UniProtKB/Swiss-Prot annotation:
This is Potassium channel toxin gamma-KTx 2.1. Changing residue 53 to A: 1.4-fold decrease in affinity to ERG-potassium channels. The record marks 41 as: Crucial for Kv11/ERG channel binding. GO terms for cellular component: extracellular region. It comes from Mesobuthus eupeus. Changing residue 55 to A: 1.1-fold decrease in affinity to Kv11/ERG potassium channels. The keyword Glycoprotein does not apply. Has the CSalpha/beta fold, which comprises one or two short alpha helices connected to anti-parallel beta-sheets stabilized by three or four disulfide bonds. Keywords: Disulfide bond, Ion channel impairing toxin, Neurotoxin, Potassium channel impairing toxin, Secreted, Signal, Toxin, Voltage-gated potassium channel impairing toxin. The inhibition potency of the toxin for ERG1 decreases as temperature increases (IC(50)=7.6 nM and IC(50)=15.3 nM at room temperature and 37 degrees Celsius, respectively), likely due to changes in the structure of the channel binding site. Changing residue 27 to A: 2.7-fold decrease in affinity to Kv11/ERG potassium channels. Changing residue 57 to A: 3.2-fold decrease in affinity to Kv11/ERG potassium channels. Expressed by the venom gland. Changing residue 41 to A: 70.6-fold decrease in affinity to Kv11/ERG potassium channels.
Length: 57
């Protein structure tokens, strides 16, 4: 039972996709400023302001 749990947990963690975020060179101060940038560049409205720059995911 424990082996099944560990295997399931490992598969879940590996499927998260750590490299999904796409950094941009657009400066920001709030995450809402990244939504139009991400929409125009990548076609997705998911974004956040990280260290003063927009990251789209």
């Amino acid at each position: 039972m424990k082996i099944s749990f560990v295997l399931l947990l490992t598969l879940f963690i590996c499927s998260i996709g750590w490299s999904e975020a796409r950094p941009t060179d657009i400066k920001c101060s709030e995450s809402y400023q990244c939504f139009p940038v991400c929409k125009s560049r990548f076609g997705k409205t998911n974004g956040r302001c990280v260290n003063g720059f927009c990251d789209c995911f």
